[in-house]
Amino acid sequence: MAKRSSLTRRGVSPRAAARARRHMRVRKKVRGTPERPRLVVTRSLKHIVAQIVDDTKGHTLVSASTLEASIRGEEGRKTEKSHLVGKVLAERAKAAGITAVVFDRAGYRYHGRVAALANGAREGGLEF
């Protein structure tokens, strides 16, 4: 029998395991500081969540999601809502005094909803 990785166990698809490996590889290099916190994106089939995290303290400073009532009520496709999440996140970050972030795509491809969120955050005034 072939040896299994700790990430390829029953119930986890090979695609999800590969994404988790990519995310771990990126997290070794990407660190958020108080001056330049980490913007991490989490995606599901229906929703997207973005958080700005200070890794030195382990605290979430600002977050935005399509699960919020104000964004959930908006009309449009998932990609358009992701763009809106990026803009809302940028507004909240500016209010908290955050202007520059390190983008952590969490192993997802920089395409579609992830790219739309990043573009929305840039339009809102965040610097990557």
Swiss-Prot record:
Presence of keyword Ribosomal protein: yes
Q: InterPro entries from the xrefs?
A: Ribosomal_uL18_bac-type, Ribosomal_uL18_bac/euk
**Comp. bias (Basic residues):** 18-31
The record's keywords, sorted A to Z, are: Ribonucleoprotein, Ribosomal protein, RNA-binding, rRNA-binding
GO CC terms, sorted: cytosolic large ribosomal subunit
Q: Please give the residue ranges the record annotates as the region Disordered.
A: 1-36
Q: Which BP terms does GO give this entry?
A: translation
Under NCBIfam families, the record lists: L18_bact
Q: Give the record's subunit note.
A: Part of the 50S ribosomal subunit; part of the 5S rRNA/L5/L18/L25 subcomplex. Contacts the 5S and 23S rRNAs.
Family of the protein in this entry: Belongs to the universal ribosomal protein uL18 family.
Q: What does this protein do?
A: This is one of the proteins that bind and probably mediate the attachment of the 5S RNA into the large ribosomal subunit, where it forms part of the central protuberance.
Q: What is the protein's name according to its record?
A: Large ribosomal subunit protein uL18
The organism of origin for this protein: Thermobifida fusca (strain YX)
Which classification does the entry list for the species? Answer: Bacteria, Bacillati, Actinomycetota, Actinomycetes, Streptosporangiales
